[in-house]
């Protein structure tokens, strides 16, 4: 009798699982269909941070943030384009965006150029790809930042954070974080988030961030997070802020 009850409980759990994940898959599939099948393509700007003479963060074993940013961004671009998105990159090679004549305020000029590209593109939303660093090597995990006065930015950040936890690191307890000071967040005319994929200052996470397999995994889950956003999911939340950019 106990064995029969156990089997029935297991079957019930399996049915519920199929229903739950089936509905989730259907919602995502519908979002993909809408994104690729409509008369007007969704337009996305992907912004791989840093580049050229600006390496960004440097990992404990020498992994450069600019390289990881670009690799993840290119994989993400391929995922989005495969589903019919129009994708504009602020950079698709290892280059900075300031002019060769610039002698001072190169960082400011670089960021201003990125905003100029976004403004001209008129995207539906913007995905900035970065890696995190911190003085304490114990910190790890992806975290998504959004402009504090942007409801759509908060919703996008929520979708991405949830998917990065579910698909990349279930032990990650970070939540989306609002910010009012980051140049890109406060100057973008479109909903924008900064995706900090992980900490280069954490030995174990840096080792993963430097591999193509993990970069592809990050890109895929960022892509899935955008699908949830397009489908109307997500809500804003706030948490403890860590160092970014």
Label for each model-derived stretch:
Residues 1-245:
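Catalytic-site microenvironment of enzymes
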């Amino acid at each position: 009798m106990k064995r029969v009850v156990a089997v029935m409980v297991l079957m019930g759990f399996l049915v519920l699982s199929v229903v739950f994940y089936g509905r989730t898959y259907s919602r995502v599939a519908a979002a993909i269909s809408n994104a690729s099948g409509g008369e007007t393509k969704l337009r996305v700007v992907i912004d791989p941070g840093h580049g050229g003479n600006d390496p960004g963060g440097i990992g404990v074993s020498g992994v450069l943030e600019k390289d990881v940013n670009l690799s993840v961004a290119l994989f993400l671009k391929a995922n989005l384009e495969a589903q019919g998105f129009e994708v504009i990159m602020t950079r698709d090679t290892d280059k900075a965006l300031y002019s060769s004549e610039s002698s001072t305020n190169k960082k400011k000029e670089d960021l201003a150029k990125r905003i100029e590209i976004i403004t001209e593109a008129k995207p539906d939303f913007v995905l900035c790809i970065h890696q995190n660093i911190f003085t304490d090597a114990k910190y790890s995990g992806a975290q998504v930042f959004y402009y504090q006065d942007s409801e759509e930015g908060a919703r996008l950040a929520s979708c991405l954070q949830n998917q990065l936890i579910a698909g990349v690191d279930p032990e990650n307890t970070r939540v989306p974080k609002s910010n009012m000071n980051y140049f890109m967040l406060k100057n973008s005319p479109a909903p924008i988030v900064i995706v900090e994929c992980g900490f280069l200052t954490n030995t174990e996470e840096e080792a993963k961030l430097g591999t193509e397999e993990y970069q592809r995994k990050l890109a895929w889950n960022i892509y899935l997070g955008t699908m949830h956003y397009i489908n109307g999911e997500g809500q804003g939340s706030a948490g403890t802020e860590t160092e970014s950019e």
